[in-house]
Amino acid sequence: MSELTARTNDEGWETVFAAWLDTSHLNDKDAILVYSVGGGDAERNISTNIVRAIELAKARSAKVFGIVGRDSGYTAKHGDVVVVIPQANPGWVTPLSEAFQAVVWHCLVSHPALQIKKTKW
């Protein structure tokens, strides 16, 4: 967390994820997982930090996975495998997208192969 806040303060929010991935030596054996409602849009200056991270991942031949709420964003258009949450009601795009993302996140952190410490419940 301290690195994220320091990078944001020193370099700006737009490059915070890409700069961290660069420092972490992102390469063709890696993947990034994007959780976003809109997925980013450089032209409209929305979530450009996500766009920059995806651009870096693609330049390094890393895979890009995503779970998003809209098929019109940068993640949906440029990701290798992207789940776009279907929206029956446009007013619910954010809560439905974030709810599904939370389910996936909980499954990932609860998987026995990924647990460092067992949960109590």
Model-derived features: positions:
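Glycine-rich phosphate-binding loops that contact phosphosugars or nucleotide phosphates
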Residues: 1-121
